[in-house]
Amino acid sequence: MLVRTALRLIFGSQHERDLKNLLPLLNAVNAQESWVLPLQESEFKQKTAEFKARAAAGEALDAFLPQAFALAREAARRVLGERPYDVQILGSLVLHHGKIVEMKTGEGKTLMSVAAAYLNSLSGRGVHIVTVNDYLAERDARWMRPVYDYLGVSVGVILSSMGSQERRCAYACDITYGTNNELGFDYLRDNMQFLTEEKTQRDFYFAIIDEIDSILIDEARTPLIISGPAENDTQHYAEVDRLVGQLQEVERNPATGDYPNEVDGEEVRGDYIVDEKNRKVSFSGPGMLHIQDVLTHAGLIQGSLFDEENFKYIHYFTQALRAHLLYRADVDYVVKDGQVQIVDEFTGRILEGRRYSDGLHQAIEAKEHIRIAQRNRTMATITFQNFFRMYKKLSGMTGTADTEALELNKIYKLEVVVLPTNLPVARVDEHDVVYLSEEEKWSAICDEIKEAHTRGQPVLVGTISIEKSEKLSALLRTRGVKHEVLNAKNHAREALIIAEAGAKGSVTIATNMAGRGTDIKLGGNPEFRARQSATAIASKHGSSSVTVQEHMQACYEAEYTRWRADYEEVKQLGGLYVIGTERHESRRIDNQLRGRSGRQGDPGRSKFFLSLDDDLMRIFGGERLKRFMSRVGMEPGEPITHSWLNKSIERAQTKVEARNFDVRKHLLEYDDVLNEQRSFIYAQRAQILIDEHVVERVYTTIEEYLNREITALRQELKRRGRLSLGAFQQNLSTLFDYALGGEDASGWNETRLGTLKQEILAHLKKNIESKYLLAGAQNMDTFIRYQYVQAIDKKWLDHLELLEILRESVYLRSYGQKNPLTEYKLEGFDLFYTMLDDIRLSIASQVVRVTVHMEEQRVPRPPHVAQAAHEFQALGQPGRGHGSLSALPIQAGAKVGRNTPCPCGSGKKYKHCCGR
């Protein structure tokens, strides 16, 4: 420790060294200012065209970086009236070099990204600026578009409401704003298209991720899923929900609070064990037998619970218990309009259309006694971890990344560089105060809020759930404190509430959704007030939005004058007072809450009020602390404040962060297996769509198949001295309608086997060539492509299910002293190679056996999988590693009957062709 401190004193911190290395580039940018100032607007566009031409000719972007950055800075000054500070230019240099910038709230991250985005757009390969929601994507694109227009680069924005053509145009722009969800779903949908021209995205070159910690860490365990309807087993969830109350939790040791160890032979009383930290439930031996008795008595099963047809009920009981014990209404989800809507644990926002995966959502619907929706089947999936690792260069910005620097470096190979604030941070972060009980804590918080409100200091209170925010709201109402509540239930008023959160005397209770991407200004927000005034004036006279803009300037001048006085008064009162009502699992989330106060050198204050009943304290040693504090004579209502307590809490948070990192890393190791397979299958699919000689793939497959079979026959001949052609003949007949004839094989040798292979291959090639003559090369190529794509899509869905089953069961291999991950990799790739062989051989078989009719036929477009990829309904849930974000394709067109002719044109019944 002393050595590290000494080295830091001598050489500076890593962040200081990183910034020092960039100073020559910053000086070079500043030196270009005299060159750029006299330029006319048209010359900016000329320079952009010149730089694009140089980049297209192979020149590195760094060759004209100083000039490009100087152009971007001057364009921002002329268009927005804001000249990026040197620290913002430093931040843009960090982004350009593929690193993460940590920049405090209110320091201008949106403007900082302009120079890096402009420079990299000159490559002609597209830059993606990624935000967490549509509102921020649209706002930032609208705000920065005039700057980019001045420079002569095009800007697009991807919104969830857009169709395919709009998306295609937006992705073709030099710079594209969009959300992480939309970019990920577009990637999956593109790989479900039948025609290359229907794809929307280009290759992944450079991305700048806003709030990068939220996307790459908080949502890292969130798989994006496009899904379709699966087996309808909704009645089982309702049946089990009625029975689950008959089960009892295993009794704990009253002295330690621990469960008995069944493996060591300790007596177990009860049916299930709850793992609150990991949100899991497991059953005891007696519990399994009790479930069997309950199901038998209810008439739902016959025989043993462990029979193949009954084993599924263990899954239904597991999810029912998780729904009742580990997922709470108004904390993890809300019930609205007859639907269970997920609440993001990190932002407090409702995650529109998302659903918990693996049947958990259905179990919660059964618990809440609302309509249970049918489960879905995964059709395409990718995690954010693997999606963003596809970019050639990745960077990002946030106010809180340094605490997660290790994870960001290990998983994404991204370094974090902390930028100094333009003005020193004047916020005072006080020690936590801890109370024995939750009720004592709430009482103290209310007293603190009322005191600050009385003197006029604005207060922002952060809560971890809707339930807690509404509880505090009720307590404040009884004390007569006027306040606003911002949570997922009233998120529509977010802009209004946040705009006034810094006004004199305001009290705002908010879940974590408060203000990521927005600033809380002391004294209120003059722009927002001016727009409200201008809108009111215009509507009073029945005027249009054009008239609103005409009134804006006058209204803004009046509001700005009032705001300056309010701002100075609130500064004198100490600025925004941030109160935390509970520590989060991650220090980073706590820092985000603190960061709402003290923007751009403003004064501020932050303080956390805790109790030993809080989740973090209770799970990580709260009972022991409570006994200790009682022994030292703490009186009810008396708080404890000490630096060692803060360190103890931070140690608990560090443990949780390390555990969550291990979980994400472990999941990534498993997902990397799927990612490698997905990359290969998508690449093959894309190549098939553009392959002008697709029939050669069929010829290769047939030849490889014959080589394998003939090799096996040669080995048999060597081993036995004679041949048995029965199985080979049966396979040829089944696959290719080919008969060997009646030749006696008793005298065959290896030479005859070689000529046999050539005879069969020549016959099958002639068969296919005759179809090309009859149907035409274009029609046959289209038919083969269609068969390939359909087979890939169908087999890939089956393969995803097999991998999921393997992943859920492979952990049992550890009991046999085997590494589950190694076993998963080995068996996963065995399944994958088997799938590839099945696809290739099934296509070769179909092409050989298809009948070509001498009439005009149009090969149809693929069925609903590809067509519906344009339209989807979002489903699925992120968070805690148990959810997924999904999109559900909508089936379009009439369903093909199993006994009707197959639409592919083979002449066979659908059930004997593509419907197999």
From Swiss-Prot:
It is found in: Cell inner membrane; Cytoplasm. ATP binds at residues 88, 106-110, 519. SMART domains: SecA_DEAD (SM00957), SecA_PP_bind (SM00958). It is a peripheral membrane protein. GO terms for cellular component: cell envelope Sec protein transport complex; cytosol; plasma membrane. InterPro entries: Helicase_ATP-bd (IPR014001), P-loop_NTPase (IPR027417), SEC_C_motif (IPR004027), SecA (IPR000185), SecA_CS (IPR020937), SecA_DEAD (IPR011115), SecA_motor_DEAD (IPR014018), SecA_preprotein_X-link_dom (IPR011130). It catalyses: ATP + H2O + cellular proteinSide 1 = ADP + phosphate + cellular proteinSide 2. GO terms for biological process: intracellular protein transmembrane transport; protein import; protein targeting; protein transport by the Sec complex. May bind 1 zinc ion per subunit. Zn(2+) binds at residues 902, 904, 913-914. Pfam families: P-loop_SecA, SEC-C, SecA_DEAD, SecA_PP_bind, SecA_SW. Gene3D superfamilies: Helical scaffold and wing domains of SecA, P-loop containing nucleotide triphosphate hydrolases, SecA, preprotein cross-linking domain. Signal peptide: none annotated. Belongs to the SecA family. Part of the Sec protein translocase complex. Interacts with the SecYEG preprotein conducting channel. Has a central role in coupling the hydrolysis of ATP to the transfer of proteins into and across the cell membrane, serving as an ATP-driven molecular motor driving the stepwise translocation of polypeptide chains across the membrane. Monomer and homodimer. Part of the essential Sec protein translocation apparatus which comprises SecA, SecYEG and auxiliary proteins SecDF. Other proteins may also be involved. This is Protein translocase subunit SecA. It comes from Treponema pallidum (strain Nichols). The gene is secA.
